[in-house]
Design a protein with these regions (language model features):
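Glycine-rich phosphate-binding loops of nucleotide-dependent enzymes
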Residues: 2-512
Length: 512
């Protein structure tokens, strides 16, 4: 019956140029349940939730709350109905404090004067009640990603929202923060709050959700009770075929040393200390070496130094026998280094460029793409079309698609196509599957293993311990800017890695 559901989205259709993002989708949310929304990137999950939150207006369909039809024209309407949303990319003002961000738009006032003490009291009470401890006076720019997510959750609670939407909430969190978030969700459920949980991680769905609705290519595939299903069945519903959840790869056959890092140190001006300290290791042709660790332990700074985004303070980096320590990014690329960056929006793509222009960002100066100083658009499109077909990059208007309009998974596929097609000697893959669904993850893992099998040296940087254990031939753990241990994935455990990642243990001697 209709009164069983706190929210009903009935026959929702939402279109964008060249694509039907939601095609006659129905979703029904019960009071006090955690309802997961699962689907490949581009399946329409975030679009559907954006309709519920008033960011988009549907072409067809209706939304009901407690059985009554409602109009949600904007996020203010959604908040008035008790609907809140934590977006995958947080909507925070970096130069504002935590407190100012939480109360922004709903500041309490009396006779036109801001009642900040009253707001602080309410925020701290919510913080204490739900275990979401924050420093109300800290600037957003100075706090961790995990802490920023707490601020987003407190924004919803401050507005007395009872229907909470989480869009890929664990995509940017460490394993410890993920466990913490799962507990917070369970606490919300006990209080009778209803949660819509967009995720691509099947383990999380099985751990915290009561039911799951699956979308595929904008269409409704069904809703299942979690207690009656399996990860394999959910994967099949999501991608329309059996998905290999384990990486199938033969033992590595390492060859020559391709990357040799010697005593690299990088100083952080922001934190006034060394972010990377005396790091040394090698990566051979035909092997995948993973740099594992909790976020914020020097991995990002090290990759910046390795790829030329920042200068190292001391040490030496050699690529296939050539000293590249002081080379430019372009020269490192010419020497055979490819880079799949951690932040695809910041360092991987120009979002307002077309897909074809993004495909040649690192090659447009080559003779095949220009003549007399002018870009040969026909050759650029021909090359882009080839990569789109070869790597199954899906977009509304093919090579002419503006990259900003593409799903995260397809943006990542475009970067991987561009970087692998350079036939590199060294592939630096940083969080290559962050925020992606199982279908895209399976695809990307296959591509990385195929590169290794071709004889490419692969340096993988990942926070995902399942990915680390499945893909790596060797694992290096980084803690506070140092390599504290080297492991064989066949003889170690996630628990052992966790101790080294947390700084509880350290091997006496680093090995190459």
């Amino acid at each position: 019956m209709a009164e069983d559901f706190v929210i009903e989205m009935l026959h929702i259709t939402k279109e964008f140029p060249g694509i039907k993002a939601n095609d006659d989708i129905t979703l029904q949310l019960r009071k006090g349940e955690v309802h997961a929304l699962l689907g490949e990137n581009g399946a329409g999950k975030s679009t559907l939730m954006s309709v519920l939150f008033g960011l988009y207006q549907p072409e067809a369909g209706q939304i009901r709350k407690n059985g009554k039809e409602v109009a949600i024209r904007n996020p203010n309407d959604a908040n008035a109905l008790g609907i809140g949303m934590v977006h995958q990319h947080f909507k925070l003002v970096e130069c504002f404090s935590v407190l100012d961000n939480i109360i922004l738009g709903v500041e309490p006032n009396k006779m036109g004067f801001l009642q900040k003490a009253e707001a602080r009291k309410k925020v701290m009470a919510l913080s204490e009640k739900y275990g979401l401890r924050v420093d109300p006076d800290a600037l957003i720019s100075d706090i961790s990603v995990g802490m920023q997510q707490r601020v987003e959750i407190l924004k919803m609670l401050y507005r007395d929202n009872e229907i909470l939407i989480f869009d890929e909430p664990t995509a940017v969190l460490t394993p410890q923060e993920i466990d913490e978030l799962m507990e917070i969700m369970r606490g919300f459920k006990k209080e009778g709050k209803s949660i819509l949980f967009i995720t691509h991680k099947l383990n999380e769905i099985m751990a915290v959700a009561d039911r799951c609705t699956v979308l595929r290519k904008g269409k409704y595939m069904g809703t299942v009770d979690i207690k009656d299903t399996t990860k394999e069945e959910l994967s099949r519903m999501m991608v329309g075929r059996d998905v290999q959840l384990q990486v199938d790869k033969k033992p590595a056959d390492p060859g020559r040393v391709v990357l040799d890092v010697e005593n690299v140190t990088m100083h952080s001006a922001q934190h006034k200390k060394d972010a990377v300290r005396n790091v040394s290791f090698q990566v051979h042709a035909g092997e995948i070496v993973c740099l594992a660790g909790i976020e914020g332990n020097g991995q990002t700074e090290f990759v910046y130094g390795l790829t030329g985004l920042e200068k190292i303070s001391s040490g030496k980096i050699t690529l296939d026998g050539k000293d590249i320590t002081n080379e430019s990014i372009r020269q490192r690329s010419k020497d055979g280094m490819s880079h799949i960056p951690e932040d695809r929006h910041k360092h991987g793509l120009v979002l307002d460029y077309s897909l074809e222009n993004n495909m040649v960002l690192q090659r447009y100066w080559q003779p095949e793409f220009q003549k007399g100083g002018f870009i040969r658009s026909d050759k650029v499109r021909e090359y882009s079309d080839k990569l789109i077909a070869q790597y199954d990059v899906r977009s509304g208007q093919g090579s002419l698609t503006t990259v900003r309009s593409m799903s995260g998974g397809n943006q990542q596929k475009a970067i991987i196509a561009r970087e692998i097609d350079k036939d590199p000697k060294l592939l630096v893959a940083v969080q290559p599957t962050r925020g992606l669904d199982v279908g895209a993850i399976e695809y990307i893992h296959r591509q990385i293993v195929a590169e290794r099998d071709k004889g490419t040296a692969v340096l993988l940087v990942s926070l995902e311990l399942d990915e680390v254990m499945n893909l790596s031939d060797r694992i290096l753990v980084m803690y506070e800017g140092e390599i504290v241990g080297e492991f064989d994935p066949h003889t170690t455990t996630v628990q052992e890695l966790g101790l080294y990642m947390a700084g509880a243990r350290k091997q006496g001697k680093e090995s190459k």
